[in-house]
A protein has these predicted regions:
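Active-site-adjacent beta-strand/loop module that shapes the phosphate/pyrophosphate-binding cleft
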Residues: 15, 78-101, 134-136
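N-terminal strand-loop-strand
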Residues: 1-41, 69
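Surface-exposed, flexible loop/turn segments at secondary-structure boundaries
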Residues: 19, 27, 80-82, 120
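A short beta-turn/loop motif at secondary-structure boundaries
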Residues: 3, 80-84, 106-107
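NUDIX/MutT-family hydrolases
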Residues: 40, 93, 102-134
């Protein structure tokens, strides 16, 4: 067991009343994060050494979706503890984006799709569900 807290970044990209979610592959192997295949998640992953949270958010979104994001704000932070893993997840909202949406890491997410905030899939990745629930409660 690894006794280390890691920092993860989750990015809600907003477009009107829609948010971008990626489908985590059913065959996805545990890549070090919290293991929940066949769920829908926001883009984002681990922060790297010497990288700000906004740099991480921009890098991860670009690596995963091919989108460039801007006008970022920190929304919340949460402790995500599962299966002997502990992540502090920084939840970031991106209010602007540009580029052509594309699946960049098909071994991790096999689809990216825009969902209305009031019509989300049931099988949300647990940290994503927490993020959305908190966001909707504050609106």
């Amino acid at each position: 067991m690894e006794n280390q807290v890691k920092v993860g970044i989750g990015v809600m990209i907003k477009c009107n009343n829609k948010v971008l979610l990626g489908h985590r592959c059913k065959s996805r192997k545990d890549t070090g994060g919290i293991f929940e295949p066949d769920t829908w998640t926001f883009p984002g992953r681990e922060q790297e050494f010497n990288e700000t949270i906004f740099e991480c958010a921009k890098r991860e979104v670009k690596e995963e979706t091919n989108l460039d994001i801007d006008n970022l704000e920190v929304f919340n932070a949460s402790d995500d503890i599962q299966l002997n893993k502990h992540y502090v997840t920084i939840q970031i909202i991106a209010n602007e984006y540009k580029g052509n949406l594309k699946v960049m890491e098909p071994n991790k997410e096999d689809e990216w799709k825009w969902f209305d905030l009031n019509d989300l899939p049931q099988n949300l990745y647990s940290p994503t569900r927490q993020f959305i629930d908190k966001y909707k409660n504050l609106k």
